[in-house]
A protein has these predicted regions:
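An N-terminal structural lobe/cap that precedes and organizes the functional/catalytic core
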Residues: 1-37
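C-terminal, well-folded lobe of enzymatic/effector domains
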Residues: 36-177
Length: 177
């Protein structure tokens, strides 16, 4: 969950001193149920493989920019609830969009297939919010972003630079597990 605003679409590290209040994630403050949920929804795909280190990095880079609105517990609950409410993996699978078995055997899809599936299944064709797609090497799907309003309740189109509006993927996306 990355806070943004219209003048600075992706602010980062808003509390730069880790010793300042809110500057460092206090894992002990996160309830065990929340940590277990985050293990499922927000694993680490980085080299460390340690989700706690990943969550700390995400908090420092993005969460600190919402600290005046969401404390650490609320920030991670909101991130989990938004992930859980979207049900993106199931939604895509229901539409026949599934990852390939590995990086050497990815499946390739047209980006519009993802967009139409999300609009049809999540928004029931009633909302015209367009997700952002971020890829490695222009085609390897890394993340799908959906922007949410200041209060964390309503989906909205993302604001920002042209890259942040459309993402970094081309029209063809490769996806693998």
């Amino acid at each position: 969950m990355w806070p943004s605003n219209h003048s600075d679409p992706q602010p980062e590290t808003c509390i730069s001193n880790p010793n300042e209040k809110g500057g460092s994630l206090d894992l002990a403050q996160l309830p065990m149920e929340l940590r277990n949920n985050l293990m499922r929804s927000w694993p680490s795909y980085s080299g460390t493989g340690n989700p706690a280190i990943f969550w700390q990095l995400e908090w420092r880079k993005h969460g600190t920019c919402s600290f005046n609105k969401f404390n650490q517990i609320k920030y991670f609950y909101e991130a989990f609830n938004n992930w859980n409410g979207m049900g993106l993996y199931d939604l895509l699978r229901f539409e026949g969009i599934v990852p390939g078995a590995s990086q050497t055997a990815p499946k390739t899809y047209d980006k519009m297939k993802f967009i139409e599936a999300i609009k049809r299944r999540h928004f029931r064709d009633e909302v015209t919010v367009i997700p952002q797609f971020y890829c490695n090497k222009g085609t390897d799907l890394r993340e799908i972003r959906m922007c949410i309003d200041y209060n964390g309740f309503e989906y909205m189109n993302c604001t920002g630079t042209s890259t942040s509006l459309v993402g970094t993927c081309g029209n063809q996306i490769q996806w693998y597990a």
